[in-house]
Design a protein with these regions (language model features):
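Specific alpha-helical transmembrane segments that line the substrate/conduction pathway
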Residues: 48-52, 97-124
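Juxtamembrane helix-loop boundary signature in multi-pass membrane transporters
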Residues: 1-21, 114-170
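Loop-to-transmembrane-helix transition segments
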Residues: 14-22, 67-92, 160-168, 214-224
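Membrane-interface helix termini and inter-helical loops of multi-pass transporters
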Residues: 30-43, 67-69, 95-99, 147-158, ...
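C-terminal ends of transmembrane helices
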Residues: 4-7, 58-70, 114-130, 174-185
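Hydrophobic alpha-helical transmembrane segments of multi-pass integral membrane proteins
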Residues: 13-18, 41-63, 77, 138-141, ...
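Hydrophobic/small/kink-forming positions within alpha-helical transmembrane segments
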Residues: 23, 27, 31, 59, ...
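Structural motif at transmembrane-helix junctions in multi-pass transporters
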Residues: 38-45, 91-108, 184-190
Length: 224
């Protein structure tokens, strides 16, 4: 199967530039994501807007690859699986936060890279040096500590939220692993297209999860 990534990617360290770019982009996204909800626009509807904004990005991605969409079975299976794991995990996270404490939910979910690391070392036979292992062992607890939210007086009942949080932890870890696995089987542009498609398909579920009995900011300041 043709490898769509450049053979010189690892040697030139371009992957590090992309990883840092992703970290920066997701960091900005994480800093801004709570603003619409604080302005009265529910997170579930925020998901719907987010999924729709992926459409022009998917179009630009396909255009950059001369409109070549991978249609073989591995492409749409991996692409759809990655999309459902990511977007579905986000919807489950909303439900976990409704009944569970954020100061426990977020540290659990934030450790999902552990799943990706274990699967990559075990199934993909990737090698990690002693220095890599030191970095991993320092990074994982750091992620959990940075994700910690101070407890409040919210009454906690039952453990459904805990199973939901563990589900998100597992889904996002698997998503990152399958993204790595799929990168050798399909172009990243096609992968993003299928991720967009599955994200949009989950919009009706996000809408049904919305509590419309509460006041919603439908003005431009809400979804914007």
């Amino acid at each position: 199967m043709q490898n769509y990534w450049s053979n010189n990617l690892g040697s030139s360290r371009r992957w590090l530039m992309f990883a840092l770019g992703t970290t920066l982009s997701w960091g900005v996204w994480g800093a801004l994501i709570e603003i619409p909800e604080k302005l009265g626009f529910p997170a579930t509807l925020g998901y719907s807007v987010w999924a729709l904004t992926m459409i022009p990005c998917a179009i630009l991605a396909l255009r950059s690859d001369n409109w070549r969409l991978a249609l073989h079975r591995e492409a749409w299976v991996f692409g759809s699986l990655i999309g459902f794991l990511g977007a579905g995990g986000q919807l489950i996270l909303f439900e976990a936060l409704r009944s569970g404490p954020a100061f426990i939910v977020f540290p659990i979910v934030s450790l999902y890279p552990a799943i990706t690391i274990i699967l990559s070392l075990w199934l993909l036979k990737e090698q990690a040096s002693t220095r890599n292992w030191i970095g991993i062992c320092l990074a994982l607890p750091a992620i959990a500590l940075l994700s910690y939210v101070a407890p409040n007086d919210t009454l906690i009942s039952g453990y459904t939220w805990l199973f939901l949080a563990m589900g998100v932890f597992l889904m996002w870890g698997l998503q990152a692993y399958f993204m790595k696995l799929a990168s050798d089987r399909m172009p990243s542009e096609s992968m993003f297209f299928y991720m967009t498609l599955t994200g949009v398909l989950l919009i009706p579920i996000a809408v049904t999860m919305t509590d419309f009995s509460q006041p919603i900011n439908w003005s431009f300041t809400g979804p914007y």
